[in-house]
A protein has these predicted regions:
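N-terminal helix-turn-helix DNA-binding module of bacterial transcription factors
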Residues: 1-60, 345-348
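Short beta-strand segments enriched in small/hydrophobic residues
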Residues: 16-21, 55-71, 178-185
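Amphipathic helical "hinge" segments at domain boundaries
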Residues: 31, 35, 44-111, 115-118, ...
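Hinge/beta->alpha junction and helix N-cap segments in small-molecule ligand-binding domains
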Residues: 50, 68-77, 95-104, 156-166, ...
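Periplasmic-binding protein-like
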Residues: 116-124, 180-182, 214, 235-246, ...
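Flexible loop/turn connectors
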Residues: 234-348
Length: 348
């Protein structure tokens, strides 16, 4: 026979009411008491009856996650944060991929409504504001990484301006004074915000990032390779901020082929901290980390608060951090630049 909540209460030495509060994360109690209840439930392989709970709470303990334009490189860490924050005991996650198809998106919204999900997280490949979902949906919606163009919606995204500032600061810390930037398409919001951050850091040091030292192109290795060759043939630079790790790897390959020493002659900082690329680059690529796993956790926590009736409208931004490797190894003295537990910053 499956264990009941009375069995949990008896084994943990608490009342049924206390056991219920401990399992549902409700009420005030000592942390060790709550942990004892959870440990006991795990030992007895207790599985709560969600159908019974739904009758009293009106909840289904399911949350949807809708990707509007397919699964990209940034989806897995964000998804991992969402899943770990919700956990098996809090809610199940239903994944839906709209693939840039409005009909498919509408279908999934209908399915999620029919399944009576408690809430929905919407994400995408870019941070650019996206058209909002209908506000008539019967559940709260939170936008993660991608943002809603409606300021009344709840959005959590990356602070790309801060990331650009961090990258330039690291190059300055390395001793660089003539810094170039090779990045993605100027049409991308994140590209423009990162440039603004880099220029702010350089201005604080009495320097500038002139337009002739900024190169735009696809987020690809060949962009970095070709731009670096052209740059080194015409300009004297001692640091390059790369708009992605793929671009950074292309830059490193080009510099290596020209006999340019990294970081002695030219230091490099990438963006994304895509470890598969950054660690395979020679030398290892220092990179800005967008803390996407943490962003996923924060998104799930914010959605749960909205489900409880406490929405948090507006756009909030998660600061970035640095992963230091051999391409720009200057030590960091400010620990907030490499810790990923910075608080969310609301838009002004």
């Amino acid at each position: 026979m499956a264990p009941t909540i009375r069995d949990i209460a008896r084994a943990a030495g608490v009342s049924v009411a206390t056991a219920s509060k401990g399992l549902n994360g409700k009420g005030r109690m000592r942390p060790e008491t709550r942990q004892r209840i959870l440990d006991t439930a795990r030992e007895l392989d207790f599985r709560p009856n969600r159908n019974a709970s739904s009758l009293t709470t009106g909840r289904t303990y399911t949350v949807g996650l809708l990707t509007r334009d397919g699964y990209g490189r940034f989806t897995p860490p964000l998804l991992g944060g969402v899943e770990d924050s919700l956990s098996v005991d809090t809610a199940s996650l239903l994944l839906c991929d709209a693939r840039r198809d409005a009909v498919r998106e509408r279908h999934y919204l209908d399915v999620l409504a029919d399944r009576r999900v408690d809430g929905l997280i919407v994400t995408g490949r870019a941070t650019d504001p996206a058209p909002p979902l209908p506000r008539t949906l019967p559940f709260p919606v939170l936008y993660a990484y991608t943002t809603s163009s409606n300021p009344d919606d709840s959005s959590i995204t990356v602070d790309d301006e801060h990331g650009g500032w961090l990258a330039a600061r690291q190059l300055l810390r390395q001793g660089c004074r003539r810094i170039a930037h090779i990045t993605g398409p100027v049409s991308v919001l994140a590209v423009r915000e990162r440039i603004a951050g880099a220029r702010r850091a350089l201005a604080e040091a009495g320097l500038e990032l002139p337009d002739n030292l900024v190169t735009y192109g696809p987020f690809a290795e060949h962009t970095g390779f070709q731009a670096a060759q052209k740059l080194m043939a015409n300009e004297q630079v001692d640091g390059i901020f790369c708009g992605s790790d793929q671009i950074g790897r292309g830059v490193a390959d080009a510099l290596g082929g020209m006999g340019v020493r990294i970081p002695d002659d030219v230091a490099l900082v990438g963006f994304d901290n895509w470890t598969l690329i950054a660690k395979a680059t020679r030398p290892g690529l220092s990179s800005v980390d967008m803390n996407l796993y943490r962003l996923g956790r924060l998104a799930a926590e914010s959605l749960l608060r909205a489900i409880d009736g406490n929405p948090e409208p507006g756009i909030r931004r998660l600061p970035c951090s640095l992963a230091i490797r051999a391409s720009c190894p200057a030590p960091i003295t400010d620990t907030t630049e490499w810790l990923d537990d910075s608080p969310l910053v609301p838009d002004a």
